[in-house]
Amino acid sequence: MSNGSIADLSGRDLDHAVHAEVMGGNVGDPDVPLYSTDWTDVWRVLDQAEAWRIHKPPAGDVVVQVLIGGKQGKHPAPTVEEAVCKAVLKARHS
């Protein structure tokens, strides 16, 4: 895995960042089930992972692996944004 920087943020901050990115809207707004195309949130989330890897094949789903708090999350998805969100959520709640 490529090393990402380690940010000193609490799990709650990370969950909020992921939630905002997953919902594509404001934190706490569950009525916006769209994925954000704002890479700021994606990189903010990856900065909080101890390690991460993005594999983007020529065809097929992007695969993202993250390591957070010693827990690994891996998820394939059509977009990098979606794969990052789901991999992080998987690591946070595994």
PLM features: what roles do these ranges have?
Residues N3:
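Predominantly extracellular beta-rich ligand-binding scaffolds that present long acidic/polar faces
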Residues I6-A77, S94:
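N-terminal segment of the canonical double-stranded RNA-binding domain
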Residues T79-V88:
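A short, charged, amphipathic alpha-helix used as a generic interaction element across diverse proteins
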Residues V88-S94:
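Short arginine-rich
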